[in-house]
Amino acid sequence: MSGLQKQEALVQEFKDLLKQEQFGSQGEIVDALKANGFDNISQSKISRMLSKFGAVRTRNARQEMVYCLPAELGVPTAQSPLKQLVLEIEHNEVMIIIQTSPGAAQLIARLLDSLSKSDGVLGTIAGDDTIFIAPSDVSKINETIKKLEQLFSKNLT
């Protein structure tokens, strides 16, 4: 098994364990992963994975504090209702700004971050209702705007 395959298997096992909603500490997650054949796991690695995947501690059905994944863990798609939340797309010579409905910016930014750099998006910063987009090539910012408008089926500019 290659390094990438091992990493993918680890991530899948990690997510499967958290879906069980029975692990109250990072140490318990480490022990469960080791029991499932992932020997090179440390508490600090689990801490980074919990942060990366947005895991939170919450009460399960037995009222125990456990780690779990947020319901929206999957990457949203442009076919989902999210595209209806984009209100306006604006830009200057170096940056693109998307205005969204209140509370929708981080979900839309997550979709944009899943695009490849060839789609024109280097990265995003999202607040509550505003997304700052750094284009991968400012000389092609108009092409990136067109791709974003197509993605969200809007002609806003």
From Swiss-Prot:
Q: Which InterPro entries match?
A: Arg_repress (IPR001669), Arg_repress_C (IPR020899), Arg_repress_C_sf (IPR036251), Arg_repress_DNA-bd (IPR020900), WH-like_DNA-bd_sf (IPR036388), WH_DNA-bd_sf (IPR036390)
An example Gene Ontology molecular-function term: arginine binding
Record carries keyword Protein biosynthesis:
no
Q: Which Pfam families match?
A: Arg_repressor, Arg_repressor_C
Q: Where are the transmembrane segments?
A: none
- The answer on whether this UniProt entry bears the keyword Transcription reads yes
Offer a single GO CC term for the protein: cytoplasm
Q: In which pathway does it act?
A: Amino-acid biosynthesis; L-arginine biosynthesis [regulation]
Looking up SUPFAM superfamilies in the UniProt record yields:
C-terminal domain of arginine repressor, Winged helix' DNA-binding domain
Superkingdom: Bacteria
Localization, UniProt:
Cytoplasm
- Could you state one GO biological process linked to this protein? regulation of arginine biosynthetic process
- Protein keywords: Amino-acid biosynthesis, Arginine biosynthesis, Cytoplasm, DNA-binding, Repressor, Transcription, Transcription regulation
Q: What is its main location?
A: cytoplasm
User: Which family is annotated?
Assistant: Belongs to the ArgR family.
PANTHER family referenced in this protein's UniProt entry, alphabetically: ARGININE REPRESSOR
What job does this protein perform? Regulates arginine biosynthesis genes.
Recorded hits in NCBIfam families, A to Z, give: argR_whole (TIGR01529), PRK05066.1 (NF003457)
This chain belongs to which protein, by name?
Arginine repressor
- Native organism: Colwellia psychrerythraea (strain 34H / ATCC BAA-681) (Vibrio psychroerythus)
